[in-house]
Amino acid sequence: QRQMCIRDSHVNLHVDKGEFVFVVGSSGSGKSTLIKLLMKELDCTSGQLIVSGERLEKMKHRRVAKYRRKLGVVFQDFRLLKDRNVYENVAFAQRVIGRSTKVIRKRVPEVLQEVGLAEKYKSFPDELSGGEQQRVALARALVNRPDILLADEPTGNLDPKTSEEIMKLLEQINEKGTTVLVVTHNKEIVNAMKKRVLTMHDGVIVSDEKE
């Protein structure tokens, strides 16, 4: 089942449901622009962009918030709420879409267990290591059970060992059926994981290597 399709004069990309895809390329190659297009932070100015059956280039503004519920997004800088503990950071993603307290109390501990942070639910971001903060960000991205997880340089601020742990976690998430798209500069991780790799240059996908 096709999850993502981009067609224009520069890019022709198809991603199937349940795939794990790396996007690599030098700074300014268009990797982060691709993430912003998929998040509907930027508008598609030409061609077609279809994600989970939604035509993004034709999407009305009022539809965007509902579409974004299908996505989980993780960033290099974690983007956690500094004045909220781990539990509250993750619960926040459910509150903004109107989930009940009962649902939140059941789901948040589940996802914290999934990312290995069940014991840290009362900790605040500044009490956590970089790797732990990224796990919180992952839990927040996963708590609403997204179809697609977008990770923009998720290991950019982490040491090699912690980076490897985060990538293993992303792989486990993918094995449960979530489509995962990872933008990265980290060649070691890309080479080690042997997944599909898209290489971008000047906004164009110049190679698409499938393992």
Q: Model regions: which residues?
A:
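Helix-to-loop junction immediately C-terminal to a conserved catalytic motif
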Residues: M39
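Short, small-residue-biased leader/transition segments that mark boundaries at the very start
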Residues: Q1-I6
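Catalytic Walker B motif of ABC-type/P-loop ATPase nucleotide-binding domains
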Residues: L149-D152
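Conserved catalytic motifs of ABC-family nucleotide-binding domains
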Residues: R145
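Conserved ABC ATPase signature
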Residues: F124-L128, E132-Q134
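Short coil-to-helix segment of the ABC ATPase nucleotide-binding domain corresponding to the Q-loop/switch region
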Residues: R84-A91
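Conserved ABC transporter NBD signature motif
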Residues: G47-R55
